[in-house]
Amino acid sequence: MSDAHGVARDQLRAFIERIERLEEEKKTIADDIKDVYGEAKGMGFDTKILKKVVALRKKDEQERMEEEAILDTYLHALGMIEAPPEG
């Protein structure tokens, strides 16, 4: 086996092992988040709404406003609201 082949193999193994460690950390974090939602639910909070709030906080104000305007337009088209708000 050539030395270059061995180096490539070692690098590949190192990448794979790093990915595996990160995947395990990701699973642990996901489990922790699930536990927090469970705690919140136990205190009477609606977890679906909490998840929406978390998603909204990730977006900037302009992005949220654009999405809300599009949503209002769709709801109006379906007759679910009177008219989209004037902006």
From Swiss-Prot:
Pfam families: GapR_DNA-bd. One of its GO terms (molecular function) is DNA binding. It comes from the Bacteria. Belongs to the UPF0335 family. This is UPF0335 protein RHE_CH03546. The lineage of its organism: Bacteria, Pseudomonadati, Pseudomonadota, Alphaproteobacteria, Hyphomicrobiales.
